[in-house]
């Protein structure tokens, strides 16, 4: 294979690895091939490397790797943000440096369109990274504690050992940012910030701005390469496309990387929209997954008290409690339908709850 084929193979493998590492721990994929590969790369391989290191190097390599991984994974740092910025900046620079045959034909509208598309990811990243995710402190605790009721299924009154106050329903203490966050979704390494009640909308904006840049790149370069296809020399549709892309390798690389990265970002965006549809956050999806595991093992019973559905484990269930055989039997009080869920994401403080 020549360099171009090797480069494409490397990009494809790297993208697959990123997909496995990003999505392998999602509850829906935990027991699929993706989840198994994630555990293989994140658990099995490190374990065997540690065994070899302990045997032949007295554990020195493992200690160094633990120190590095602790900084990357468990310390609030901007490394992945810099990686994101480097990727899109190199791609944009390559487009303008090697795409003079396109840009010299641009009209004013084209330039406005391209420059707007280029600037949006930088602006949205800054907004998402600098936004307050919904930090809870003593000043706003009363308001935050009334925002959502406890469902007594996945959220119960519980004190935060770090912040020293009772955690409001749907909140969580982020060990990276060292704050409690309202309606905690997850800590996002791509924006180096938590995603919570106040800035989930900005996280969505960041994803949308990223995907529009990738789509813009795919459409413009795709149109360009389609015009370069030589159907007389390469009558096959795919071969004519392939050789058109190879004829301008630098732009071809930008096109292919945009194509592959767009799949990754679309998967992430699709998963986030699924969570909105389902009426829970990434953090809550893990709790619901644990509950589903208990239901599958026939360990959960339900009963009603003052019109509210409550759950109990088999050992604590009363005689009149009903065995839960399906997750569809369990009410999610935080799910108000896709429209209302999305509305509350965009306008987070126009909430639908009024607890006392």
Swiss-Prot record:
It catalyses: L-cysteinyl-[protein] + hexadecanoyl-CoA = S-hexadecanoyl-L-cysteinyl-[protein] + CoA. Residues 158-208 form the DHHC domain. It comes from the Eukaryota. Residues 1-2, 100-107, 223-253 are lumenal. It is found in: Endoplasmic reticulum membrane. The DHHC domain is required for palmitoyltransferase activity. This is Palmitoyltransferase swf1. It comes from Schizosaccharomyces pombe (strain 972 / ATCC 24843). The lineage of its organism: Eukaryota, Fungi, Dikarya, Ascomycota, Taphrinomycotina. The gene is swf1.
């Amino acid at each position: 294979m020549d360099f171009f084929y090797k480069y494409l193979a490397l990009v494809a493998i790297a993208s697959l690895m990123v997909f496995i590492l990003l999505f392998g721990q999602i509850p829906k994929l935990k027991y699929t091939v993706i989840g198994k590969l994630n555990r293989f790369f994140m658990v099995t391989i490190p374990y065997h490397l540690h065994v070899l290191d302990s045997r032949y190097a007295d554990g020195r390599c493992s200690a160094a790797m633990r120190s590095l991984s602790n900084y990357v994974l468990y310390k609030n740092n901007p490394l992945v943000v810099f990686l994101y910025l480097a990727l899109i900046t190199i791609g944009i620079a390559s487009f303008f440096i090697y795409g003079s045959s396109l840009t010299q034909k641009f009209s004013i509208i084209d330039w406005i369109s391209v420059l707007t598309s280029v600037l949006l990811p930088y602006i949205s990243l800054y907004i998402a990274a600098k936004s307050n995710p919904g930090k809870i402190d003593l000043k706003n605790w009363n308001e935050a504690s009334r925002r959502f009721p406890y469902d007594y299924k996945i959220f119960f009154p519980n004190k935060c050992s770090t912040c020293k106050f009772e955690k409001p329903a749907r909140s969580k203490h982020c060990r990276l940012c060292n704050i409690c966050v309202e309606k905690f979704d997850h800590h996002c390494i791509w924006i180096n910030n938590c995603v919570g009640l106040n800035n989930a909308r900005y996280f969505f904006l960041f994803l949308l701005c990223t995907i529009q840049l990738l789509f813009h790149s795919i459409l413009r370069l795709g149109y360009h390469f389609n015009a370069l296809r030589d159907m007389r020399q390469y009558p096959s549709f795919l071969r004519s496309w392939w050789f058109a892309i190879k004829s301008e390798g630098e732009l071809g690389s930008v096109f292919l990387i945009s194509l592959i990265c767009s799949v990754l970002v679309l998967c992430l965006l699709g998963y986030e929209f699924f969570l909105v549809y389902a009426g829970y956050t990434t953090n809550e999806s893990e709790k619901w997954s644990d509950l589903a595991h208990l239901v599958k093992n026939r360990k959960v019973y339900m009963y009603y008290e003052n019109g509210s559905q409550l759950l109990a484990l088999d050992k604590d269930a009363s005689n009149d409690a009903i065995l839960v055989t399906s997750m569809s039997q369990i009410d999610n009080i935080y799910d108000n339908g896709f429209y209302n869920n999305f509305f509350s994401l965009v306008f987070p403080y126009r909430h639908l709850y009024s607890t006392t």
